[in-house]
Regions:
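Short amphipathic alpha-helix adjacent to the substrate-entry channel of hydrolases
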Residues: 106-126
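Alpha/beta-hydrolase active-site loop
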Residues: 136-157
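C-terminal catalytic histidine-bearing segment of alpha/beta-hydrolase fold enzymes
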Residues: 251, 265-268, 272-321
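Primarily recognizes the serine-hydrolase "nucleophile elbow" in alpha/beta-hydrolase
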Residues: 150-214
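Conserved alpha/beta-hydrolase "acid-adjacent" motif
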Residues: 257-265
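N-terminal cap/lid segment of alpha/beta-hydrolase-fold proteins
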Residues: 26-84
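Short beta-strand/loop motif that positions the catalytic acidic residue
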Residues: 244, 250-253
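Mobile cap/lid helix-loop segments that gate and shape the active-site cleft of serine hydrolases
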Residues: 48-54, 205-240
Length: 321
């Protein structure tokens, strides 16, 4: 290994520094093909977008960086009734999935049911975009999400939110990214973030990245994580978890052949050995249903809300717990 590559890997382990070289891509993954796919996705999002409930206001495309993907949407109550205690609204900070190369903050599965359930109860929902493969490596995607978190906390008071009552949430690739940030809070705090309450990871298969990458897997994971074990370790929530990290809930599908619940259970045991709090919520739902059905009136939604309510008395009050 050259000195240059050794320095790069040390930087990744120390702080998830951006890669200077792109991760390997499949031969069919050209910039033109990727852009066409993203355009079709954006068109489908527009076609399927449901109207907002009348008591919800949306603030669209707030920037947290110069790139067009570095944007977030804010969903808040359209009429604000002051809390008798003077407390500001808790915030769910949602990160979409899409294999680290696709997805959008406005997809109905990402926001529709969550917004419809939580915003009328006085919980703000922030939905975040971030830069994607092949242009932006996963290490820098984590930096994007951390910067979005810091910016959202800094601006929260402007739209009625409480910077100290954020709950991180993500699905699939987004669940990996929020788990990684939650595992090592210093990553976001270096960018100006304040402490948050905890995280809900919706069906991530990448809690222990080295273990997953050493087993048979789809090529998309090679595109995202490459072949170097040092890079895997730097992006692995299991290996990056530090004592004192906020609590986490790992929701996992019992319907997937790759059995993400086994990884979630091992992750929870590891967190417990470090003195932390983590719980696993297995669900007989598909990978997509775990995201899309959160917010429906169901035992599943109530179980997630139970974890959220356990983090803070104001959150519990807003959720009616």
């Amino acid at each position: 290994m050259t000195l240059q590559r050794m320095a790069l890997f040390c930087a990744l382990v120390a702080g998830l520094a951006p890669l200077t070289q792109a991760q390997p891509l499949s031969r069919s993954d050209t910039p033109q093909a990727t852009e066409r796919l993203r355009t079709r996705l954006a068109e489908r999002v527009q076609e399927r977008r449901a109207p907002l409930p009348p008591d919800v206001q949306k603030i669209t495309d707030l920037p947290y960086g110069p790139d067009a993907r570095q944007r977030m949407d804010i969903y808040r109550p359209s009429t604000s009734t002051p809390d008798p205690s003077g407390a500001r609204a808790p915030v769910v900070f949602m990160v979409h999935g899409g294999g680290w190369r696709n997805g959008d903050k406005a997809m109905p599965s990402v926001v529709q049911n969550k917004v419809a359930r939580w915003v009328p109860r006085g919980v703000i929902v922030v939905s975040v975009n971030y830069r994607l493969l092949p242009d932006t490596p996963v290490s820098q995607q984590a930096q994007d999400v951390a910067q979005a978190l810091a910016t959202a906390q800094q601006q929260a008071a402007q739209w009625g939110g409480d910077a100290g009552r954020f709950i991180l949430m993500g699905h699939s690739a987004g669940a990996h990214l929020v788990s990684l940030i939650n595992a090592q809070p210093a990553l976001a705090q270096r960018l100006g973030a304040w402490p948050w309450l905890g995280a809900v990871a919706l069906d991530s298969a990448m809690l222990n990245v080295p273990q997953f990458m050493r087993a048979p897997h789809l090529p998309l994971y090679d595109d995202a994580f490459g072949t170097n074990p040092v890079y895997w370790h730097a992006l692995s929530p299991f290996h990056q978890w530090v004592s004192g990290a906020p609590p986490a809930q790992f929701v996992c599908s019992t319907e997937r052949p790759d059995q993400p619940c086994l990884q979630a259970q091992a992750m929870a045991r590891h967190v417990h050995t470090l003195g932390g709090r983590a719980e696993v919520l297995p669900q007989p739902l598909t990978h997509g249903e775990i995201n899309a059905e959160l917010g429906l009136d169901s035992d599943y939604t109530r179980a997630v809300e139970g974890f959220m309510a356990s983090l803070d008395a104001v959150v519990a009050q807003k959720l009616g717990r």
